[in-house]
From Swiss-Prot:
This is Beta-galactosidase 7. The lineage of its organism: Eukaryota, Viridiplantae, Streptophyta, Embryophyta, Tracheophyta. Residues 740-826 form the SUEL-type lectin domain. Expressed in flowers. Belongs to the glycosyl hydrolase 35 family. It comes from Arabidopsis thaliana (Mouse-ear cress). InterPro entries: BetaGal_gal-bd, Galactose-bd-like_sf, GHD, Gly_Hdrlase_35_cat, Glyco_hydro_35_CS, Glycoside_Hdrlase_35, Glycoside_hydrolase_SF, Lectin_gal-bd_dom. Keywords: Apoplast, Glycoprotein, Glycosidase, Hydrolase, Secreted, Signal. Gene3D superfamilies: 2.60.120.740, Galactose-binding domain-like, Glycosidases.
């Protein structure tokens, strides 16, 4: 009896433990309408924040701002080459601590979407693949290749195991509600033929076997193998419909802006157009949407891909590179999220009916037993509309969506922005004058003697030699010439067929010149005249520089990098041209630069005694600079102005803040003074900063700095520049503007700084834009500037009711809609 009683108690104990465990778990599934959480259909709003593109100290603030902006989830890729830089040697430290990042999301009360890939694209170096993978025998990426599949499965399994061990999947009570395998393979699958289909089937089976207890995604993958869920990526996904009728309409990448390339302009996507794309998606049946990016961040070190992706990955996201609110985008979307959430039951359970109102205007009605919710969408790119709907008139601007949660009152219109615009600026304090020391890069052995670390017959691709350990690779060979050589003449050139992103050439220790890629032409011919060849042995030294490895396209891993030849000397004798191909000569190779290998950027560098503090050179190639500075006071984000420098890399206290290239200006054409949000967006539309450096300012995370005492900035200058203008600043809100519509409330804030003055205010039909507002033909009879000043000046934030009650009668305006234009100084 005692034994039987004990067995019964033990059984009850295990049942209790199991019940408690299940109570903590979250059941994530889906039907044809939506992702379901614990059996309930959900509207889910997500945003991409990539943990390596910020610092661990920044994560809580970024995630909380995303939550305050109305998001339910944070999405991130997992970056294979960052975590496994050498085969079976892993790094999950610092800002690579993905487990800590997911737990930080959980601590904020948000869900997580984990896109393991492990191909990520993401404008990340080599698409996230480690280069050692490429250098394995018989390797082909993203196809039926046993070596690749084994390595992909190994890394994917490791990440899943790490998440399971920390109980981070929703099925274990964690925040991860969705995971992704592969990435945008549908864009390239046709290039791989039957093996592409077999590979994607294998991916699905492999992922499914890992038993994570939440759905798997495959983005941009029509007819994704079951049970994978296909999703859409793009600027607009309202016209997208899943090929599988049991899959909900999901959008994994709504591109909030675009990335920047060196030599390119700054992309800009308006808040109106981004909100329009979101509202259209939910109007047409979407229920899951993710912003790519919600915070773009910074490509620290050498992680930027492309080639030619800049260090800044700001992406014109709702949170800027430094973590500040990008207004009005952040606030305008927050208001939309609030309205959409109020309609969640209608959007996920309601019967859908659609009415074509003509002239590209459509209404959509979601009806439940409790009531109805409506959208009125105007996709006409030029004409505003006065729409009569259910017996009422609604003004729906061109290229906008009006949202009516009760099918009666307009709660939101995507083109009617009632959120402030924040103009960020550098603080006005006088910059600290930096005292620089310098030393040359020790390159004489390569330039004069052609001496390297390894020797090969013929030219070898840069990736194969460096394993991506460095941006730099020396190619060096020798050539014997005598007077009788048919090549010899007074008119000779060095000709190089190159795939180097930047090429520097030396002959017999003399600099011949350089060439770098422009306009995306990464296959080019370099040819320069050489006057210093000698009878006897001649040394030719070529420095190949990579600026991020290709990250997208079919078979992108096999794209050439470096100097693939031919390399030749060309002699011109009258009409006769004689060419001597050196490609199959014996070549010496030297990986990296000596200063990198000696870690001159480290604060513990043993070469500190060799730095000079006299006769600071400017315009000198291959030069190291170093200076001490004090961290700017306060908590605002810190930036360093590298104007005056050429190209290179910068470190703060030994930590790389990325590549710099402020001497590379964008073209002078393609920018407009006015940006019209109407009409389909592309990365060139509304671009700005023509004729200016693609990137002048570089992010210095506060966690890289010593708050008290000295800090060290180290620069490696590749092309030649002047460091005397380098200075540190903080980024603050300088001006706040708003152009709010009547019958709304506008919230105004200088982001933790007091509002100091009202520069302009007018209620009626004000003209112009932020920085150039003017009084229109009518305005309220109360002094708008005094009214706003009373409400706002001296405060950190204020709320202004945009109405005639606040600003007085506007009889002169007639029946036309009234607006408040206001500009505040911080």
């Amino acid at each position: 009896m005692k034994m039987k009683h004990f067995t019964r108690l033990l059984s009850l104990f295990f049942i209790l433990i199991t019940s408690l465990s299940l109570a903590k778990s979250t059941i994530v599934s889906h039907d044809e309408r939506a992702i379901t959480i614990n059996g309930k259909r959900r509207i889910l709003l997500s945003g991409s924040i990539h943990y390596p593109r910020s610092t661990a100290d920044m994560w809580p603030d970024l995630i909380n701002k995303a939550k305050d902006g109305g998001l339910d989830a944070i999405e991130t890729y997992v970056f294979w080459n960052a975590h496994e830089p050498k085969r079976r040697e892993y790094d999950f430290s610092g800002n690579l601590d993905v487990v800590r990042f997911i737990k930080t999301i959980q601590d904020a009360g948000l869900y997580s979407v984990l896109r393991i890939g492990p191909y990520v694209c993401a404008e990340w170096n080599y698409g996230g693949f480690p280069v050692w993978l490429h250098n394995m025998p018989n390797m082909k990426f993203r196809t039926v290749n046993p070596s690749f599949m084994n390595e992909m499965q190994n890394f994917t399994t490791k990440i899943v195991k790490m998440m399971k061990e920390e109980k981070l999947f929703a099925s274990q009570g964690g925040p991860i509600i969705l995971a992704q395998i592969e990435n945008e393979y549908g864009n390239v699958i046709s290039s791989y033929g039957a093996e592409g289909k077999a590979y994607i089937d294998w991916c699905a089976n492999m992922a499914n076997s890992l038993d994570i207890g939440v759905p798997w995604l495959m983005c941009q993958q029509p007819n994704a193998p079951q049970p994978m869920l296909e999703t859409c990526n793009g600027f607009y996904c309202d016209q997208y419909e899943p090929t599988n009728p049991s899959t909900p309409k999901m959008w994994t990448e709504n591109w909030t802006g675009w990335f920047k390339n060196w030599g390119g302009k700054h992309p800009y996507r308006t808040a109106e157009d981004l909100a329009f794309s979101v509202a259209r998606f939910f109007q047409t049946g979407g229920t899951f949407q993710n912003y790519y990016m919600y915070h773009g961040g910074t490509n620290f070190g050498r992680v930027a891909g492309g080639p030619y992706i800049t260090t800044s990955y700001d992406y014109h996201a709702p949170l800027d590179e430094f973590g500040n609110l990008n207004q009005p985008k952040w606030g305008h979307l927050k208001q939309l999220h609030t309205v959409l959430k109020s309609m969640e039951k209608s959007l996920t359970y309601g019967n859908i009916s659609r009415i074509d109102l003509g002239n590209s205007i459509k209404a959509t009605i979601y009806t439940t037993k409790e009531g109805s919710s409506c959208f009125i969408g105007n996709v006409n790119a030029t004409a505003d509309a006065l729409v009569n709907f259910k017996g009422k008139d609604y003004h729906v601007p061109a290229w906008s969506v009006s949202v009516l949660p009760d099918c009666d009152k307009e709660a939101y219109n995507t083109a009617k922005v009632n959120t402030q615009t924040s103009i960020m600026t550098e603080d006005s304090s006088k910059p600290e004058r930096l005292e620089w020391t310098w030393r040359p890069e020790s390159a004489q052995k390569m330039i004069l003697k052609g001496s390297g670390d390894l020797i090969a017959k013929g030219l070898v691709d840069q990736k194969d030699v460096t394993n991506d350990a460095s941006d730099y690779l020396w190619y060096m060979t020798r050539l014997h010439l005598d007077k009788k050589d048919p090549l010899w003449s007074r008119n000779m050139t060095l000709r190089v067929h190159s795939n180097a992103h930047v090429l520097h050439a030396y002959v017999n220790g003399k600099y011949v010149g350089n060439q770098f890629v422009k306009d995306g032409k990464f296959d080019y011919r370099f040819e320069r005249k050489v006057n210093h060849l000698v009878h006897g042995t001649n040394h030719i030294s070529l420095l190949s520089v990579s600026v991020g490895l290709q990250n997208y396209g079919p078979f992108f891993e096999s794209g050439p990098t470096g100097i693939n030849g031919p390399v030749s000397l060309v002699g011109y004798k009258g009409e006769e041209t004689i060419e001597k191909d050196l490609s199959q000569h014996q070549w010496d190779y030297k990986i990296g630069l000596n200063g990198y290998n000696d870690k001159l950027f480290s604060i513990k560098s043993v070469g500190h005694q060799k730095w000079a503090n006299e006769k600071l050179p400017t315009g000198r190639m291959l030069t190291w600079y170093k200076a001490k500075f004090k961290a700017p006071l306060g908590k605002e984000p810190v930036i360093v102005d590298l104007n005056g420098l050429g190209k290179g890399e910068a470190w703060i206290n030994g930590q790389s803040i990325g590549r710099y290239w402020p001497s590379f200006n964008s073209s002078d054409d393609g920018c407009k003074d006015e940006c019209d949000y109407r009409g389909a967006y592309g990365s060139d539309k509304c671009a700005f900063m023509c004729g200016k450096p693609t990137q002048r300012w570089y992010h210095v995370p506060r966690s890289f700095l010593n708050a008290s005492g000295h800090n060290t900035i180290t620069l490696f200058e590749e092309m030649g520049g002047n460091p005397s203008m380098v200075n540190f600043k903080t980024v603050v809100v300088g001006t706040v503007c708003a152009r709010a519509h009547e019958h709304n409330k506008v919230e105004l804030s200088c982001h933790n700084r007091p509002i100091s003055a009202v520069k302009f205010a007018s209620f009626g039909n004000p003209l112009g834009h932020c920085g150039s507002f003017a009084v229109g033909t009518c305005q309220g009879d109360k002094d708008a500037a005094k009214t706003v000043a009373k409400e706002c000046v001296g405060k950190l934030n204020c709320t202004v009711n945009v109405s005639s009650d606040t600003f007085g009668s506007t009889l002169d305006c007639g029946d036309s809609p009234k607006k408040l234009a206001v500009e505040l100084e911080c």
